[in-house]
């Protein structure tokens, strides 16, 4: 029962420090502590002073080896609220419908990143921990650094704190059948409260293909906020409320929209 869950959550709260991680990172001068999940990656972001790289490495190495889950119940409520907001967004529903047409038998089209309400109703902490131990392993992680730092010294620090992290033996990568060729236009409608609009998309190969550089140039030629073909011929002449073009360069497939 939910009252039992709440009572246990209150007991757990006695061991919880609110915003513990943010406070820890702020103590070493970090700004912009954040994370996001997309179709292809889960990414954790920090903006740290270059003289705090060692403290950053010490914290992150411990964090990703020894996950401590606190505030699970309250965090779940936050995620559920995000789902509710997305369900009320015509743009979000339209975007999902477009990818369903482009990749009907691939997860890009069959599910959203946040999932369905049913997925959030009864989450399993056991499954979450199993997922962590399978995928949060060094042979499935990339560390990307940019800024004013000594590369050799920084690599030595990373080796010091991450070098003994054992590779995961259970790591698997999902494989999906190739999408069938699109031989004729596909269309659908999304009903909502927003003004009528049209979203069009063309499916291409994945982001690691050279073709994507060309697609990015085409996208900028169409729409760049000032002198794109759509900007000049439609927006500036007030033939539509708004136009735009963007490239979804995902790992398995890209879409020019």
Model-derived features: where do they sit?
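A common structural junction motif
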Residues: 62-69, 162-169
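Non-catalytic beta-strand/loop surface segments
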Residues: 1-51, 85-140, 164-209, 220-257
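Short amphipathic alpha-helices in soluble, non-transmembrane regions
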Residues: 58-62, 156-161
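Solvent-exposed, non-transmembrane alpha-helical starts
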Residues: 54-56, 73, 208-212
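Helix N-cap motif at beta-to-alpha junctions
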Residues: 49-52, 147-152
């Amino acid at each position: 029962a939910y009252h039992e869950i709440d009572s246990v959550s209150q007991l757990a709260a006695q061991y919880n420090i609110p915003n513990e991680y943010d406070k820890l990172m702020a103590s070493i001068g970090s700004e912009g502590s954040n994370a996001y999940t997309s179709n292809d990656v889960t990414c954790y972001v920090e903006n740290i002073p270059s003289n705090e790289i060692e403290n950053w490495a010490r914290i992150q190495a411990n964090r990703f080896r020894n996950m401590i889950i606190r505030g699970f119940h309250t965090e779940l409520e936050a995620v559920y609220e995000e789902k509710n907001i997305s369900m009320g967004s015509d743009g979000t529903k339209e975007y999902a419908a477009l990818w369903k047409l482009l990749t009907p038998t691939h997860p890009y089209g069959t599910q959203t990143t946040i999932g369905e309400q049913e997925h959030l109703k009864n989450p399993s902490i056991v499954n979450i921990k199993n997922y962590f131990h399978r995928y949060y392993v060094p042979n499935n992680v990339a560390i990307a650094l940019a800024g004013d730092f000594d590369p050799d010294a920084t690599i030595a620090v990373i080796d010091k704190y991450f070098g003994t992290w054992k590779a995961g033996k259970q790591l698997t990568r999902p494989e999906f059948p190739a999408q069938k060729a699109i031989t004729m236009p596909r269309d659908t409608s999304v009903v909502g409260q927003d003004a009528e609009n049209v979203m069009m998309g063309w499916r291409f190969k994945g982001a690691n293909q050279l073709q994507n550089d060309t697609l990015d140039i085409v996208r900028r030629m169409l729409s760049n906020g000032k002198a794109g073909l759509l900007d000049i011929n439609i927006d500036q002449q007030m033939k539509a409320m708004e136009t735009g073009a963007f490239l979804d360069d995902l790992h398995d497939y890209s879409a020019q929209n």
